[in-house]
Amino acid sequence: IMKHRILALVLAGMLTAAATACGSTNSKTSKNADAKPTVAYKDMQVGETATDLKADLKILTNRTDLVDSDFQDYISEFNAMYPNITITYEGITDYDTDATTRLSSGDWGDICCIPTTVDKSELSNYFEKIGDYGDFKDTYEFADKQMFNNEVYGIPTMGNVSGVVYNKAVFEKAGITELPTDPETFLADLKLIQEKTDAIPLYTNYAAGWTLTAWDAYISGGATGDADFKNNKLVHSKDPFAKHDDMTGPFAVYDTLYEAVKQGLTEEDPTTTDWEGCKAQINEGNIGCMVLGSWAVPQMQAGGPNADDIA
C-alpha cells in the first residue's frame, strides 16, 4: 500500500514538474507561482493518468540505504506504467544541511524529503502544494505535518516511534536480562556493557548532528506520560526543564545523555563518529545501543550478518 502511495506522489511530482519546471531555476524559490499542476492529486490514478508524459525527475532522499535497492524496485514498477519517465534517486547522508543549502540555491531536483529546517510558512517558497488537507486526512496519517494554511506540501512515507536500538547479544553478554525502564537502570546497564564486553555502551552519533535530535523526542510523552506536554504544556510551564525528584520530565532525558558521557559510557571521540559505519558496528556487536527510533532498526539489521541480534 505504501509503495503505491509513494508512486502516486511521484506521479504528482511528475505532473507538477511538467507544469512548473520545478527546481529548474536558480532563484531562492523553485516554483512558478502562476503555474498549476495539470491534474489535482485527488484525481490522479496511478497507471492511468498521463501515461504518455515524458520527463526526467531527480529525487533527493535521506535513505541512502535504499537508493540502490528498494528504490530501484520502485523505479521499475513506476516505469512499467510510465516508460517515458526517467527517475534518478540521490542519497544524501547529512541530509538536512545539504538539502537546505541546495534548496536555497535552487539546484536540487524535483522531489525531495522536506528538510526539518524549512519553516512551515516557507513551504510555498520551495514547493508546489499537492492538495488541500481535506484531500489527504482520511487517507494518510500525519498529513498535516507539512501543511500551511490548510495546504499540504508533503505526505509522510512512514510513521516512527522513538526508542533505543540495541544489540541483544551484547546485552546478554553483559548479563542484562531485563530492559531498563528508568534513567538510573539504563546507566547501570551501560556500565555493565562497559565492564563485561568490548562494545561501546552508548554510541551518540554526535558528528552527524541530526541524530542527536532523537533525544528531543523523549521530552514529551516518553518522559512525562503526557501526550500533550510537548505541544501544549511545555511553552506554558514556568520551568519545564527543572529537575524533578522522581527523575521524570525533560531534565531527566538530557541528564541521562550528560551522565553517560560524563561517566565515559560513550565513544572516546564523539567528533569521529560515523553514521553509515555505525550500522555495521552495532550489527557486529561493537556497539551496545543507540538512541534513535523504530525507523533505524531495519537499517541496523541490514548492516551485517546478525540481523536477529538487533531490536
Question: Residues of each region from the PLM?
Answer:
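Short, low-complexity disordered leader/linker segments with a strong preference
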Residues: 1-57, 80, 136
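Extracytoplasmic/periplasmic substrate-binding proteins
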Residues: 58-62, 119, 255-311
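Short, solvent-exposed loop/beta-turn-alpha elements that line the ligand-binding surface or hinge
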Residues: 129-140, 222-252, 302-305
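Short, well-ordered beta-strand elements
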Residues: 39-43, 52-65, 85-90, 111, ...
